[in-house]
Amino acid sequence: MNYLKVLAILSLLFIFCGSVYGAGEADSPDINGVNAVIDDTITVENASLTYDKLITSNNCEEVVIGDNSIWDVPIREGPIVENDNTSIPDITLKGENGNNMSFNNPADVFINESFNFQMVFKNLGDATGFQPYIQLIAPDELTHFTVSYSNRKIVPIKVGVFNESTYDNTTGLYTLRDPFTKKEVHGPANSTFYILQYPLGSFTVDAPDAVLNITSGIGVLEIGKLLNFTVTPVFRYGNSPIDDPVNYPPIYGETVTGWVNPVVVKIDKSSSLNEHETATGSNFPFSYSVNINIANGAKIENITITDVIPSDVMYLGSPVLYDSKGRVIDSSLYTIEEPAGNKTGGKLILKLKEAVGDLSTTSITLKYKAYAPEFDNSTGDNITIINSETGEGIAAASTVDMNYTYVNDTYNASNSYSIYLKSLATQKYSEILTGSGQLHPVVPHNLIVYKIDFEISDYFAFDDLVVYDKFDTHKVGSAQKFLSEYEPVLSIYGKTWELNESYYSVVSLGDIDESVTFYISKFLKDNNISTSLKGGYYTNRSVNQGAMVGSLNFVAKVIIHYSNGSSVVSNDLVINHVKTSATVLNTFNTVSDNSYTQLRVPSVTLKKDIIAVNGEIINDTDFYKVYPGQNITFVLDIHFPTGSVNDFIVTDFLPIPLFNLKGFNLVNSTTGVIPKGGYWAYANDSGFLYDENTGKVIVPKIGIDTFNNALSFNFGNTLDNMAHPVDVRLWFTFQVSSEPMADQLNLANLAEMKFKDSIDVVYASSNIVLMLTNEPELEITKYVNDTKILENIENATEVEYNITITNTGHSAAYDINCSWWFC
């Protein structure tokens, strides 16, 4: 056999490749959904060949006809690009609580109900990956999947079920094929194979995490028996934008297992107390609530709830059982064993024959009243709960336990809860008011009304009560000004008084105040209102003088700068701390209590869209069809609630190779005019940001990152002294490239913004626009006109070939280059 001549024959038979490039202008006839037929004749010389099968070529794939071949020849597979860089797909699973859904920390999920979790996709490699998707293998107990990415719905592709029809006797495995990679995928019996495809063509190294929000559900399962599913991240095209599995095979990440714990009951305990604290004494009663949530449609029986009341708390009675709609349940349907009325602590035991869950967040609620007395008498001795000399508060912990039967098996659920018992308790509140009195988010120049409530235990009396209020945010200082024109108002003993400047002092830093201190006891003494603040039973344990409570209201203004000179910007927390302190009467011991409020400045928001194609304004749509050679104009709509933000940068990650950043012009073209390809501009209705240092309009710094195919606009630190909202609209235009890529791909073009607050916490948010690629896609068929001639092939035999090229894609193909070669 002549090796070279055999290769020549084989090359003509099956080694043929077509290349398609979409040019801006057609230099040759185009192919648009029609066939192009090429006839060619070749003379074969010095051939010596025997065979008993025919190999032809269809789309550069071998099609074998016949039985066995004695041919033994190398097959050309195309050039292999040597590159050590690679993409590495990675996936993590996050439950509703933000924790990983691991074996040791499974997600507790109600049977017969839906639950939410997230799949977070990353590229941990050092090269761009293409066409990311997730292989999901889920047991049949997971009843459905609803998927979204950046608020856009993604429809899961159900590949099939691993059942008897997919069982491979040879390997002993249940086997399906991934329709994207054509590779085998194995799974447990009766599990289902899904594909969750991101609408992302390329996924660069520095691209933000791609988060899928998943809603699934489970049916009626064995309680406590862990359920698991697996996810495997894949780059379908590996490190290449085109489907070239020989040179760029799919890249798989590590398979991750998510764990779910089926539950039928969840229980928790809470109270009506603000900040979970109370002054002691019967003048400060509160309610405990035992909240039971039962899975939808689940019937539980033989219910016993045992609520262990702390020995520091006195049960007051009045137990009431409510259903999921807040209706009182007939007391004849349950029994309650109550603690002894003259003893602290004890157990409240409720027995209920049965209950059925629904989709409400709470199926049954048990409420009862209690208070913190002076003594713990649960052991028969009167033990003082709060030391009468120091007045130091304590925590009172309680537990609730529930036993029940579900489908003839007994289960248990429990929870613990603590409240804080104090001699002096303080809570703080804040409210933002406009001139009309309407609620409003906090921004610089707003007025904040602060309210401080305080309660004094029935068994204590205090002198020298002082309220110290500090305007302070960690690291940056104060950004508030106490407004003396709004006189502080003190409410106590059922009356109100305005406090003049004799009864408060301000630590001022000029146009900013650091703190204000209010002298409550001094005011009461100077005005002959009271010499000390005494609890209701302090003077006589048998005579109730009523609850000793008070409140203090005052107004502060938010300033544009902090005391350290930095600006109040988006996402900042405007924080206010309060500390009340007083001396226990007839002692030298001081008691204090703290509280605080925080209000957040609104965040920047981002929206991305396509506004024009080839310079013409277009209407909104879910998917934009894009074709090679088109000029696509994108718009970034960025809303700045106060015009002030730190280190603001917005980065647009453009799909590779759909758009090419090379040659992009860094200079703004004419504002208000749709820019031509490779340019950017402010929109005609855009606002502008101002530099924090110079006060001038900011021209953003343009960044070109060819590695990540990313365009960035860096505005740095911005400041609007009047805190006016600003809407910035940026236009930029790119031409759809003629680089080969797949047809009819749903691609997401992602833009991400990042910025910092005043204490350098970084915030990020992203938005996408969806595009549908319309590319040429050629099918190539080559065959010998007369195959009989091959049966008696000899030197000088003429062989005539037909080559047919068909465009099955959605865009015309130009500059068709057809190549064949002999090896």
Language-model region placement:
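Exported/extracytosolic protein signature
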Residues: V44-C823
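Sec-dependent signal peptide cleavage junction
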Residues: F16-V34
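Generic short amphipathic/hydrophobic targeting helices enriched at N-termini
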Residues: N2, I38, N59-E61
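Short, ordered "entry" segments at domain starts
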Residues: V34-I38, I42, S69
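Sec-dependent N-terminal signal peptides of Gram-positive bacterial secreted proteins and lipoproteins
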Residues: Y3-Y21
